[in-house]
Amino acid sequence: DKRFVFQKNFDYATYVDAFGDEELAFKKAFQALLNFSDHESLDLCGRRIAVSAPIDMQAAEGSKTVFAIRRVIRNGQFQPVDGPVWDPTVVTTSASYASTDPLRLTNVVNVGQIAIGSLVTGFGVGREIYVRAVDTVANTVTLSQELYGAAASQSYTFTRFKYLLDFSGFDDLAQFVIDDVEFLCNGEASGIMLAKEGLAFHLRDCFINK
């Protein structure tokens, strides 16, 4: 959990030389980037980073859940290492819904198994509706959008995809830029999970290949 900041040669290649491990080098470089390294961007030096498991970006930083100063990751590639770690986590369970409380499922059975960021599917559920919050005490799930035509009580399926870069641990991440980066998902991984809130998350000249 200790920070390691290169002041002179602040780039990914230098961190790889220091740590000898691609993923650890990226995590330590990202940690330094968000902790006043006197650099606003992290150059990946055109390198392809083999990712063995989803990278929890907030855990890599370790101390912040809010960050609102411009930072950039640029010039490289991320590619998953094939394996079951990328398989989506799927939970099917029952819950209650009322149009008077349109963004909440109540009486959710086994609510603790549902991950924030999960895609919600079921009767009356539109496209791209996700889990914003889970309350294991009240047995409720907060939704990103309201439902239309859902029954008062029914089954729902919650699918949590696995992302190369997962920023969902941040409560608010603003002015963050990913520039000239390719995400080679290879049919295994998803690309990027955004933070819960944040102004101007910018993908610039990037490719996300399924």
Regions found by a protein language model. Give the residues of each.
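Short linear interaction motifs
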Residues: 19-34, 52-56, 113-114, 183-186
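Surface-exposed loop/turn positions
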Residues: 40, 115-118
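Feature marks extracellular polysaccharide-active and adherence modules
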Residues: 43-45, 52, 74-79, 123, ...
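Detector for repetitive beta-architecture
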Residues: 1-3, 9-12, 18-19, 23, ...
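Glycine- and acidic/polar-rich repeat regions and solenoidal domains
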Residues: 23-29, 58-64, 162-168, 184, ...
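Small/polar beta-strand repeat architecture
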Residues: 3-14, 21, 87-101, 109-112, ...
